[in-house]
Amino acid sequence: MLMGKWKILAAGLALLLGASGTAVRAESVDYPQAMVKLICDLKAYSAEKKPGFGLIGNGGAGLFLEQDGNTGENVGRLLQAFDGTMTESVNYRWEVEQGRAVRTNEADTEYFHQALAPAVTAGLPVLSLDYVDAKDMAEDSYQKNQEKGYIPWASFRRELDALPQDKPFKRNDRDMAALSQVQNYMVLLNPSKFGSREAYLEALRGTDYDLLIVDLFYGPEPLTAGEVASLKQKAHGGRRLVYAYMSVGEAETYRYYWQREWQDNPPCWLAEANTDWQGSFKVKYWRPEWQQILYGSPEAYLDKIISSGFDGAFLDVVDAYYYFLSHEAGEQG
């Protein structure tokens, strides 16, 4: 998950005791393969509904490596299904120490580089999001990410709730027809600081980013096709891409699909609460009941994104597979 998923992975994904949700028990599931299959199914479905619709995955860098039971076949399928991938905290972490941003340790940075190398080699656009709080950190982040062939963004706002004050990295007026052309991007997932829906949209329209990643909703209502279309033009000219957020590995209590009775009587696909992120629950993403919430009907999340005219979907919590792998290993240990 943006703003904290890396923290959970780094902590080893310890069992969250005493949390609401069904207990995690070992099932006969190939967790990496199940996640890759879900992503491939989402790709096939979206391509049929809207040719050219793109998918960016977040948190799934480990699936580009043959490890933890992941196969070369899975890697190849994932590279074909994704139009881009994002990794957070390659150089600067989301966590702070003594109120200051901190550099990612060298071992983790090197792991990210190794995991992302197959994507870079295959020509898959790699978005890197670092969290910083000083100009020299931002400059260092942009330099290091650019050297690796990543599309960089150094965010000063961990909450991803405001527009950056600086101009976009490598600002340009060119039309963006594909993610492979993107040179800069911005993520804004929490619009609560904007005074109104129109103020929020107007602020986004006034930017020059090649790619915007935003939430499908403002308040209880999704953005309309007209509103999304108005975001596709950069302030100083040129077509840009606009993607909508969708979590594939966690359910969120503030989403339209959430039912109150699930808190006391959780469905079979709901797993442990994410205590690092209030209102989020891990999901057994391979279960058809959860996948029906994601896609396949007019009320499904992906279908709403497509209906609103977005260019693609930003799939968060792809690393949910590792959560279940870790729990299974802990039970066997």
Task: Map each language-model feature to its residues.
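Glycan-processing catalytic domains of CAZymes
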Residues: T22-G333
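Bacterial N-terminal signal peptides that target proteins for export
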Residues: L2-L9
